[in-house]
Amino acid sequence: LDKPNRLQVKETTFNTYDYKLFGEIKGVDDYFDLIDALNYASPDDEFIIRIHSGGGSLGTADVIINAIQNTPARVHGYIESLCGSASTIIFLSCHTYSISPRAEFFVHTASSGTIGKEHENYASIMFDRKRVHKMIRDAYEGLLTEQEIDDVLKGQDYYFDAEELGERLEAYTEFQQKKFEAELEAFQKEQEDALDCGVKPKK
């Protein structure tokens, strides 16, 4: 008698993307290739974003971060050498991360300039201040202490070498995992409460 086939083979097709985020982060149109690849990726695809950048445009960083957070693919951030300012927020938005032995990581608040009438400048500055403060708190929560985040918002710069950054990333990963579990538990409870009340749960 023929023996049953115990081996099943599943053929899969996936892509691995290796992207170099080097130099100053400039206009968003310089990153359409990365953004489009993330937007059209499949769950089996993988991205490696290699970073050597002192930062740049927060607006462009925002668009890249949105693409990373919304892609079904897995995105790994790797610091080749320098990672500062806006590029640190991109790095921390990746799903996993690693660093080279010579990695440098620095954090500071945003800088900007405005041209126009005094009352227009004031309104613009206050709006940007509120937006940037929220971005900094969201990005570095778990990596920096609350006091360190407050210091950054007051103008303090922080610099970490590979050893200290590695230790902080371990704590940051644990913090993010606990945060995810708490949010998932709260969502599940909300769904259960909705069902108990006879209300259609959210999708």
Residue ranges and their predicted role:
Residues 1, 96, 170:
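Residue-level marker of positions within ordered structural domains that often coincide
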Residues 1-6, 185-203:
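Intrinsically disordered, low-complexity segments enriched in small/flexible residues
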Residues 2, 18, 29-36, 44-45, ...:
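Acidic-enriched, low-complexity/disordered segments with a strong bias for Aspartate over Glutamate
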Residues 47, 75, 114-188, 199-201:
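Charged, glycine-interspersed solvent-exposed loop segments at helix/strand-loop junctions
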Residues 5-119:
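Cleft-lining beta-strand/loop regions that shape enzyme active-site pockets
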